[in-house]
């Protein structure tokens, strides 16, 4: 079931363009980070202040049907806006990895589980390791698990 509400495209033009191209092609185009060859997925959330639907491309870090959503923001000192969407609405999230989106629930990781998924994320996208050295915050990692039908 798709999230209900008004869709508010990203203020970032490249994000808007990538989401539109990915969705319109069923994930066959715009499915890598800006021609890097590194696969992405799109996740959909609700904004906690506006209630509007937001869509965000992130690196595809998948293992056994679960996905890590890494809130790196390039190693900036603050979290990306979408971090707050996931914190506010962890059960109101969709993920698209291919032609059809599916409902997921997310939870923020800690401890050994965080370390395990962080290593997986760095293996997929090595710049994450550099991002970690650029910030004093622990870069949040959420685990997205498909909801049972």
Predicted segments, located by residue:
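Short beta-strand element of the conserved SAM-dependent methyltransferase core
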Residues: 43, 142-146
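Extreme N-terminal tail/first-helix region
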Residues: 1-34
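Short coil/turn segments at secondary-structure boundaries
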Residues: 33-37, 132-136
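Short strand-connecting beta-turns/loops that link adjacent beta-strands
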Residues: 63-65, 100, 149
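Short beta-strand segments
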Residues: 37-72
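Short, structured beta-strand-loop surface elements
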Residues: 4-6, 73-128, 134-138, 146
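Short helix-to-loop capping/linker segments positioned immediately adjacent to catalytic or ligand/cofactor-binding
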Residues: 29-31, 50, 128-132
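Short hydrophobic/aromatic beta-strand or adjacent loop that forms the aromatic wall/cage
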Residues: 40, 138-141
